[in-house]
């Protein structure tokens, strides 16, 4: 078997394992890959693969924290069904806060970051289900708030 074919099989197996949404640690992924014939896999290789494919830890149907692949790998757009993932938008006069469904904050933040300063966004910080958005100027907070509400079709 050619080296490229082995790598392709590894990637296929890796993605298939993550789709099962049952692996809570990198060590569990290493063990599963070893068991199906990929002996030269270690934690650092799995870590690089998780980063390469944009895998995130989120809660599965059993509410366990597991690794999974993102729904989309490209830069999300507002035409994506992302608005369904936003639960609440609020601000305190200085910073905007968005609450999302579990595991969705980083995806939403990535889309917001792609809008950038032209839309009044200086930067975002995302956790699992919460995003902080800093406006380009404190005086723009109300305008940014209204824009984000409109973007995700929420009412204030």
Curated annotation (Swiss-Prot):
Cytoplasm recorded as keyword: yes
Domain of life: Bacteria
Main subcellular location: cytoplasm
GO biological process: L-arginine biosynthetic process; protein complex oligomerization; regulation of arginine biosynthetic process
GO cellular component: cytoplasm
Subcellular location: Cytoplasm
Keyword Repressor belongs to the record: yes
Signal peptide start-end: none
GO molecular function (one): arginine binding
Pathway per the UniProt entry: Amino-acid biosynthesis; L-arginine biosynthesis [regulation]
Keyword annotations of the record: Amino-acid biosynthesis, Arginine biosynthesis, Cytoplasm, DNA-binding, Repressor, Transcription, Transcription regulation
HAMAP family the UniProt entry points to: Arg_repressor
Protein's job: Regulates arginine biosynthesis genes.
Family assignment from sequence similarity: Belongs to the ArgR family.
Official protein name in the record: Arginine repressor
Species the sequence originates in: Tolumonas auensis (strain DSM 9187 / NBRC 110442 / TA 4)
């Amino acid at each position: 078997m050619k080296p490229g074919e082995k790598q392709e099989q590894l990637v296929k197996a890796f993605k298939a394992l993550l789709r099962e949404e049952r692996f809570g640690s990198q060590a569990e992924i290493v063990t599963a890959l070893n068991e199906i014939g990929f002996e030269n896999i270690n934690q650092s290789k799995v870590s690089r693969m998780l980063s390469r494919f944009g895998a995130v830890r989120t809660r599965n149907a059993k509410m366990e924290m597991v690794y999974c692949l993102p729904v989309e790998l490209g830069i999300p757009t507002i035409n994506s069904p992302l608005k369904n993932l936003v639960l609440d938008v609020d601000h305190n006069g200085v910073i905007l806060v968005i609450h999302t469904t579990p595991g969705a904050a980083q995806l939403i933040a990535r889309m917001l970051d792609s809008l950038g300063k032209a839309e009044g966004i200086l930067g975002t910080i995302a956790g699992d289900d919460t995003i902080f958005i800093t406006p380009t100027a404190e005086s723009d907070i109300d305008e940014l708030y209204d824009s984000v509400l409109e973007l995700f079709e929420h009412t204030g």
